[in-house]
């Protein structure tokens, strides 16, 4: 009996979780390069939103500027239908990038850095007071990086009724192209590609479509999917992945109220971002944060050209 117990592997020993990778790195087991590669794929850009500021109007953070998209035949850019347009006229992501850069109201994107294990479906595995250290303001310098940011926000805001296998095939081709342009000089692009890889595969899994890479489906989401579809599961287990009110205790200065407008859909991948206290933290961070993380240089050591 004792031999049988000792032969049973611990779940961390056969998983790709962050804990398992750290254990392998410390023990010296496994291929070190492969471990480092997988560790570098754990952080993601989440709650990606465009930012616009106009005097006299609340700062707008939106994840739904793109109503619909498809991949161009050349697979090097996206064709977008922007939200609020009266017709379904398409615009290429390159042209939209040029328009945004020329618009003084456009302030780039903001996002939150989460690891795969901190993304807990309908809640966040980080204490609310620490979240302000996880937000980043980013202004893409190239059209492809801009398109990758748009794609992140688009995937985050999709729901199960908008599942489209043919679109996922297109997006996989677009991501393959984006990955082919990643170099040591383009660490931010790699980071954005990693995020899109996680989100695309997870969205496919939640939509009951076989993902392109099952090793990069966010772990909490697949567990939650199985728990939700299983009869007789303890409510306590389900509650681990549901929204909590921890953030209500985080006191945001009253002066920030009404200074921001956050617009996101109730998508399959952004259930954790619907809470009012999180919006207050973002607004306070944007208007009153000191030493805010801004740009690629705050995340990576970059090479000087």
Curated annotation (Swiss-Prot):
Keyword Oxidoreductase tagged: no
Subcellular location, principal: virion
Origin: domain of life: Viruses
Stored InterPro entries: Herpes_UL7
One Gene Ontology CC term in the entry: host cell Golgi apparatus
Protein localization: Virion; Virion tegument; Host cytoplasm; Host Golgi apparatus
Disulfide bond entries: none
Record carries keyword Zinc: no
Transmembrane segments: none
Keywords for this protein: Host cytoplasm, Host Golgi apparatus, Virion, Virion tegument
Any Pfam family: Herpes_UL7
Function in brief: Plays a critical role in cytoplasmic virus egress. Participates in the final step of tegumentation and envelope acquisition within the host cytoplasm.
Family per similarity comment: Belongs to the herpesviridae cytoplasmic envelopment protein 1 family.
Protein name: Cytoplasmic envelopment protein 1
């Amino acid at each position: 009996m004792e031999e049988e117990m000792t032969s049973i592997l611990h779940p961390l020993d056969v998983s790709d979780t962050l804990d398992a990778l750290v254990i392998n790195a410390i023990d010296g087991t496994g291929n070190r390069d492969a471990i480092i590669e997988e560790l570098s794929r754990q952080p993601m850009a989440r709650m990606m939103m465009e930012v616009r500021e106009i005097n006299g109007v609340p700062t707008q953070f939106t994840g739904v500027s793109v109503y619909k998209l498809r991949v161009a035949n050349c697979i090097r850019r996206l064709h977008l239908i922007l939200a609020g347009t009266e017709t379904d006229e398409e615009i290429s992501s390159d042209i939209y990038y040029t328009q945004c850069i020329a618009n003084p109201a456009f302030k780039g994107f903001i996002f939150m850095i989460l690891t795969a294990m901190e993304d807990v479906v309908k809640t966040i595995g980080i204490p609310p007071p620490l979240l302000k250290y996880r937000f980043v303001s980013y202004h893409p310098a190239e059209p492809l990086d801009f398109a990758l940011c748009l794609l992140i926000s688009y995937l985050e805001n999709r729901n199960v009724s908008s599942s489209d296998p043919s679109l996922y095939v297109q997006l996989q081709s677009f991501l393959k192209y984006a990955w082919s342009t990643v170099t040591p000089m383009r660490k931010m692009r790699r980071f954005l590609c990693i995020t899109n890889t996680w989100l695309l595969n997870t969205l496919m899994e939640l939509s009951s479509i076989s993902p392109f890479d099952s090793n990069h489906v966010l772990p909490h989401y697949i567990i939650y999917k199985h728990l939700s579809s299983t009869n007789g599961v303890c409510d306590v287990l389900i509650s681990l992945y549901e929204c909590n009110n921890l953030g209500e205790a985080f006191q945001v200065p009253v002066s920030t109220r009404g200074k921001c407008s956050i617009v996101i859909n109730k998508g399959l991948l952004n259930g954790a971002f619907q809470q009012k206290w999180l919006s207050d933290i973002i607004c306070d961070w944007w208007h009153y944060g000191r030493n805010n993380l801004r740009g690629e240089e705050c995340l990576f050591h970059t090479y000087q050209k």
